[in-house]
Amino acid sequence: MFLKAYFSSDFTIVDVRNVSEVKEGKIFSNSISIPLAEARDRVNEIPTDKPIVVHCAGGYRSAAASSLIQSKLNGSVKVFDLGDAVKEFQ
């Protein structure tokens, strides 16, 4: 639990799971929910004052979204893909 709280405070966390998945429960309470299908149009909603960590349920969508977000933000902030390591926080 300590690691989860520490992790949540030092990064902006973006959850790219579908709305129905998020309704079943957030993995990080302070994450921003932006489904992968909406990521391109909603990048401007992501704060850039801290490094960004992108997660989904297993790694595939977060890989695509982190690449897209990094590209849209032109490298102005570090963007990390949590990948399948998200399972360690569930």
Language model features with spans:
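Rhodanese-like catalytic fold shared by cysteine-dependent sulfurtransferases
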Residues: 1-12, 16-90
